[in-house]
Design a protein with these regions (language model features):
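Glycine-rich phosphate-binding loop of actin/hexokinase-like ATP-binding domains
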Residues: 65-70, 74-93, 135, 139-170, ...
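Glycine-rich beta-strand-to-loop/alpha-helix junction loops that act as flexible
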Residues: 56-62, 191-193, 235-237
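Acidic-glycine-rich active-site phosphate/pyrophosphate-binding loop
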Residues: 10-13, 189-202, 243-255
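Gly/Ser/Thr-rich active-site cleft segment
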Residues: 103-216
């Protein structure tokens, strides 16, 4: 919780459980994310009863996916970014895409791996057809939490790295490789855009919700990555080197984010 001058007023943090079922299967309970957001908001309100919250924004891990039914209930535990169950499907899809296509989409020959949403969609379609048939949306953690807070279905382009092109749009030719995939993805809006308000029955009801984006991009931005050609090193669950530059040199292992807010981030490695 920060004031309008950027001063830290209060903060909340809490661990939550990651279930490692096997080397390939790693999951989280998406309800844990939302319960802790509500706990944090309640704590902020109790500690700062006179506080008028102007806005709330979301940031989360990416390459973690929740399959939701038409009521917005999770059909499976969230498939965590470390989960590799879809490696066969990833290889199948990757073999259908040329390096020339990848460079035209992303500026670099980025492979489709087991953490890519298109790989996981194909895995669910093959291995859990009943779940696939019931799936209305496939969401990232921050988008799931925005949905639970506001009822709005939305995502942002940067959180969907590998699924959007340099124009910040979903790649039709990629999505067409898994029948039914395009209809199960949330619409995209800018990360700075208001996408809803907190529901009336929740703490700080009526507060504007700003879309936000992924953890690595926000972390590098907060470390000074908005400055042109400034090198950034971010250490945490992933070790990330990044630089903001308009120059593009396709390099295996380097992710080039689509330009957004006049920032074109090059980063790697990310896992």
């Amino acid at each position: 919780l920060v004031d309008t001058a950027g001063k830290l007023i209060s903060y909340f943090n809490s661990p939550y459980y990651t279930k490692t079922i096997s080397v390939e299967h790693v999951e989280q309970d998406p309800n844990d994310w939302f319960k802790l957001i509500l706990k944090g908001l309640t704590e902020f309100k109790n500690k700062n009863p006179s506080c008028q919250l102007s806005a709330l924004s979301m940031c989360s891990q990416v390459n973690t996916h929740v399959f939701l039914d038409e009521r917005g209930e999770a059909l499976l535990p969230a498939i965590f970014w470390q989960d590799t169950r879809a490696k066969v499907e990833a290889n199948e899809i990757d073999s259908k895409i040329s390096n020339e296509q990848k460079i035209s989409w992303w500026g670099t020959p980025m492979p489709i791996d087991a953490s890519h949403v298109i790989s996981r969609m194909l895995w669910v379609k093959k291995n859990k057809p009943d779940v696939w048939a019931k799936t209305k949306y496939v969401m990232l953690p921050k988008d799931y939490c925005i949905f639970k807070l506001s009822g709005e279905v939305v995502s942002d382009p940067l959180s969907n790295i590998g699924l959007v092109d340099n124009n910040l749009k979903y790649i039709d030719d990629l999505l067409s490789l898994v029948s039914g995939a395009p209809a199960k993805l949330p619409p995209l809006k800018k990360m700075t855009e208001q996408v809803g308000v907190i529901k009336k029955e929740l703490p700080f009801n009526g507060t504007k919700i700003i879309n936000g984006t992924m953890d690595a991009w926000i972390g590098i931005l907060g470390s000074g990555g908005f400055e042109n050609k400034k090198n950034i090193y971010l250490s945490g669950t992933s070790e990330i080197l990044g630089i903001n530059s308009k120059e593009v040199m396709p390099t295996p292992g380097i992710i080039i984010f689509p330009e957004d807010e006049n920032i074109k981030l090059h980063a790697g490695p990310t896992q």
